[in-house]
């Protein structure tokens, strides 16, 4: 053990290095000295094994703690640091699978105790979902329309068809894990030798390494594109509601399904109409004479102009209902109603002739107005006990 190099020195990190720093250093060195990158180079192969041995210890918190305390002797099967009892207990239970006792031993030796996992090679992966927002007019939301949206998403590389490899070449089997996507390492404990399995850090669980990456996608298998899609806006959709387009998200990896596209609708405010559920409200002005004498007027609706009758003596704030002139029900038949509120406008400027006519009118109704006013003050006196 005395001839072995310090593990921290091998990876080129300080003893106080974080897990992330150790992992970063390992990946850099592993790629540099990997046998696939240095075919026939025995020195590089030996260096690669040395790097993996160092990382196997320093990447495991428990092993690292034992190494920091005992050095290389921590893993000497004939020494106390290796987990034996110091009296030659080297074989123990061999590669025994502790089965139901795993939870007990895990408390002492960590979650990796006796682990035998299935292949960690990553298979097909679903593409990511995408979220967009789309602005539509009040009328478009009411009656529906078809609009176009440009989506930025990752799509299958047209050059390599998603393999990530340059055409005419194939990925090579990872020598670190022999194509399994996993590496095994043995650990000696007071109960014997156990086998742990982890994802291969060289191929990241793929089992293969791309030595000739596709020039279009850089070996990733997907490229970013801006794609135009047609979106059908259903009649009756409301502000804030979402339309989902299945399979229109980012393309999957290794033949995995594509993600979905979710479009949130933003309805522009209308200068006249306000929506309440499936009903439409609006306010229109009428003149004093129209309210007093009655009239037939035109009012705006979503379908165009509609005539309504204003009865004689209509008061300001009166609401008229136009049945079936509201918003269509979403994915259903029928429509809401429209409610028209009238506001009586008082003229701000009058010429002398108009003023004279109003004075005459005031004289004609003067007694009535006086009686109404008198009645009002009498009620006030009664209420106040005057």
From Swiss-Prot:
A zinc finger (CR-type) spans 144-226. One of its GO terms (cellular component) is cytoplasm. Residues 6-71 form the J domain. One of its GO terms (biological process) is response to heat. The J domain is necessary and sufficient to stimulate DnaK ATPase activity. Zinc center 1 plays an important role in the autonomous, DnaK-independent chaperone activity of DnaJ. Zinc center 2 is essential for interaction with DnaK and for DnaJ activity. CXXCXGXG motif repeats lie at residues 157-164, 174-181, 200-207, 214-221. It comes from Acetivibrio thermocellus (strain ATCC 27405 / DSM 1237 / JCM 9322 / NBRC 103400 / NCIMB 10682 / NRRL B-4536 / VPI 7372) (Clostridium thermocellum). CDD domains: DnaJ (cd06257), DnaJ_C (cd10747), DnaJ_zf (cd10719). Its main location: cytoplasm. InterPro entries: DnaJ, DnaJ_C, DnaJ_domain, DnaJ_domain_CS, HSP40/DnaJ_pept-bd, HSP_DnaJ_Cys-rich_dom, HSP_DnaJ_Cys-rich_dom_sf, J_dom_sf. NCBIfam families: DnaJ_bact (TIGR02349), PRK10767.1 (NF008035), PRK14277.1 (NF010870). Binds 2 Zn(2+) ions per monomer. Its cofactor is Zn(2+). This is Chaperone protein DnaJ.
């Amino acid at each position: 053990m005395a001839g072995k190099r310090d593990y921290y020195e091998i990876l080129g990190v300080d003893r106080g290095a974080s897990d992330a720093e150790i992992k970063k250093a390992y990946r850099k060195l592993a790629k540099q000295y990997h046998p696939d990158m240095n075919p026939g180079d025995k020195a590089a192969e030996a260096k690669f094994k040395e790097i993996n041995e160092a990382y196997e210890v320093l990447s495991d918190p428990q092993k690292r703690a034992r190494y920091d305390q005992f050095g290389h002797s921590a893993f000497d099967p004939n020494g106390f640091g290796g987990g034996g009892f110091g009296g030659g207990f080297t074989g123990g239970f061999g590669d025994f699978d502790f089965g139901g006792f795993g939870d007990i031993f895990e408390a002492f030796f960590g979650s990796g105790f006796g682990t035998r996992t299935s292949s960690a090679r990553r298979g097909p992966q679903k593409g990511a979902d995408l979220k967009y927002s789309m602005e539509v007019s009040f009328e478009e939301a009411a009656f529906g329309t078809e609009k176009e949206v440009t989506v930025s998403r990752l799509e299958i590389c047209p050059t390599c068809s998603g393999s990530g490899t340059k055409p005419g070449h194939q990925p090579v089997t990872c020598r670190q894990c022999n194509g399994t996507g996993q590496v095994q390492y043995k650990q000696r404990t007071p109960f014997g030798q156990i086998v742990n399995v982890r994802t291969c850090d060289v191929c990241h669980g793929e089992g293969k390494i791309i030595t000739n990456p596709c020039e279009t996608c850089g070996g990733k298998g997907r490229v970013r594109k801006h794609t135009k899609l047609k979106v059908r806006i259903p009649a009756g959709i409301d502000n804030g509601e979402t339309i989902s387009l299945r399979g229109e998200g980012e393309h999957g990896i290794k033949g995995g399904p594509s993600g979905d596209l979710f479009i949130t609708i933003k309805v522009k405010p209308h200068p006249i109409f306000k929506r309440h559920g499936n009903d439409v409200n609006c306010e229109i002005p009428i003149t004093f004479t129209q309210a007093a004498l009655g009239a037939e007027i035109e009012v705006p609706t979503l379908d165009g102009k509609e005539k309504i009758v204003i009865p004689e003596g209509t008061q300001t704030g009166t609401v008229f209902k136009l049945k079936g002139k509201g918003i269509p029900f979403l994915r259903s038949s029928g429509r809401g109603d429209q409610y028209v509120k009238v506001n009586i406008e008082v003229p701000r400027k009058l010429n002398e002739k108009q003023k004279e006519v109003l004075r005459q009118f005031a004289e004609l109704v003067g007694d009535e107005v006086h009686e109404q006013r008198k009645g009002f003050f009498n009620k006030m006196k009664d209420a106040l006990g005057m």
